[in-house]
Amino acid sequence: SSAAAASSETDSASADDGPTWDIDVRSYETHERVEHYVRTFSGDASTRIADRLSKGTRYEPMIREKFRKAGMPEDMYYLALIESGYDPHATSRALAVGMWQFMTSTAKGVGMRVDWWVDERRDPVRATEGAIVFLSALQRQFGSLYLAAAAYNGGPGRVSRGLSRLDQAEGATRDDLALELVDGSYLPRETRNYVPQLIAAALVGK
C-alpha cells in the first residue's frame, strides 16, 4: 500500500542521518572559530579544499587503516589536510617536511630516518606511522585528542603552559579545555586556529 511505502521511505531516511565522525565535532560545531573556518572552507577556500581532499583520496585508505589499527580515530585523517593538503613533499618556512610536517628532531624522536640519503618524512606511510606515534604520546600526556592536536602544532610545552594559566571552567572536559585555550591568548595564533580548523575540515570533508 501507499502507506506502507511511505513508512518504508521514512524508515530509510531515518536510518541515514548523514555523516558520522569518530572525533567529537558536534559538541563544537557552533564554536565561533569553528563556524568561521567552516564558512571559509565552504566558501572562499572551497576550490582549494576540494583540490586537497581530492589529492588525499590516494592516501585516505592507508591513513584511516593505520589510525584504526593503532586504536586512534580515523578522522585524524583531516589533520594532514590542515598540515600539508596531503602533499608528501610539502616544506614549510620553518623547514617542517612532508604530509605530516615533521621537524627533523621530532621525526627522529619517533623513529623516522632523516639523513643525507633518506628522509622518511616524505614517505606517506612512514610519516603517517610517525604521526600516530607522536599523537598517541601527546594524547596520553594531555588526556585529550584536541589538546594533543594543539600540542602537535605548537609543542607540548606551550600547551602545558597555557593550561597552567587557564581559569578552567568547572565540569569542563579535556577536549573543552582545548577550545578554551583557543578563546584566550594562551597560545600562538596559528595554534589557536589549529583545532578549529581540524574540526571544520572534518565537518566539510564529509
Residue ranges and their predicted role:
Residues S1-G71:
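An acidic, Gly/Ser/Thr/Pro-rich helix-cap/linker signature
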Residues Y37-S54, Y86-R93, Q101-L147, Q168-Y186:
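Substrate-binding clefts and substrate-entry loops adjacent to catalytic sites
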Residues P61, E65, Y77, E129-S136, ...:
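Solvent-exposed, polar/charged alpha-helical surfaces in well-ordered, non-transmembrane soluble domains
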Residues M72-P88, A148-G155, I199-A200:
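Short, functionally critical alpha-helical segments immediately adjacent to catalytic or ligand/cofactor-binding
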Residues S84-D87, T106-G109, G155-V159, V204-G205:
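Solvent-exposed loop/turn segments at secondary-structure junctions
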Residues Q139, G143-P156, S160-G162:
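Short helix/loop segments within enzyme catalytic domains
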Residues R189-K206:
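Catalytic cores of secreted or luminal carbohydrate-active enzymes
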